[in-house]
């Protein structure tokens, strides 16, 4: 018999210490990694439930194991909420991650060697959009597209590449692009060559759910997402479609199970269901609106302080600071800011002369600080502190003073009250 009062702290103090340390780090550091966010205690409660014990290969009503009548309810709730949230007629909530959701779409719609137009990783794309080190770049013929001199997606070049290479799929979406994508234009280009339009909206799903960023679901044949990032749910993946085609839905379902996964994680699916419900609340829309406001406010300060921003600004939750005109690398900036309890990630910029391990930029995202309660005033103040550290990255006094300011604001605006 298992006793409910078992705890990690008494049984495994070494592991518990690492959990406590990470909890403290999250509370005492300002998180600016664009792909990270703080999920709600309700989501964590679902993930810590007894649903973790249940194996449920298959789909609701069509399982390979018995005893699934109640987890069927859980998964159905998640499916119906996802469809309602994004305006889809089909949803698969089983992918364990965004990358696995993407892998399933490739498997469902393509054959190895088929041609895909995907955004260049160096221009803001994602590993699974055709990077040569990823399965997508190894199994498929990837033709990369990118941004123009203004930092915007070059749709003229995208159309030219589509007409020249006749891809089976055009892939939209990004991991480091601060603009607004014209999904209708991408569908128009895909239709000209008879290609599928597949959109990975992982980074902007929360913004899309709140109506503050264009929804790709009405335009694409298939859309994938993570359920964390701006959506602020558990770590996991999602596949959506507004195309009323049962054959397409069957292909996608089969590509997830049994194609790329076995049993779904029912405790995580429960967490997804909670997150989808939370995303339907009015306060979630206000949160996402503030995410964009904070991102724009930070950009204003960086520009005023003489820093270069890729594309000159932002229309979403993230932006890239470009150091190619400075004697500063992304790796150095990342390290210096870390000493001041400010967490960012080094990031390549378009036409970056430095390696991906060094880079000439950093990526900054506002979802986590906004979740803590930052408004424009705090976002601008924070951007100023970042500039102070970058301008004086070898000055221990400046770093120490900034760290003290960070600790103070983190105490005033905790992650979990």
Curated annotation (Swiss-Prot):
Enzyme class name: transferase
PANTHER family: SERINE HYDROXYMETHYLTRANSFERASE (PTHR11680:SF50)
Designated gene of the protein: glyA
Protein's job: Catalyzes the reversible interconversion of serine and glycine with tetrahydrofolate (THF) serving as the one-carbon carrier. This reaction serves as the major source of one-carbon groups required for the biosynthesis of purines, thymidylate, methionine, and other important biomolecules. Also exhibits THF-independent aldolase activity toward beta-hydroxyamino acids, producing glycine and aldehydes, via a retro-aldol mechanism.
Catalytic activity: (6R)-5,10-methylene-5,6,7,8-tetrahydrofolate + glycine + H2O = (6S)-5,6,7,8-tetrahydrofolate + L-serine
Identification of the protein by name: Serine hydroxymethyltransferase
First-listed, main subcellular location of the protein, grouped into a coarse class: cytoplasm
GO molecular function annotation: glycine hydroxymethyltransferase activity; pyridoxal phosphate binding
Species of provenance: Tolumonas auensis (strain DSM 9187 / NBRC 110442 / TA 4)
Enzyme Commission number(s) of this protein: 2.1.2.1
Site (Plays an important role in substrate specificity) location in chain: 228
Compartmental location: Cytoplasm
Family affiliation: Belongs to the SHMT family.
Pathway: One-carbon metabolism; tetrahydrofolate interconversion; Amino-acid biosynthesis; glycine biosynthesis; glycine from L-serine: step 1/1
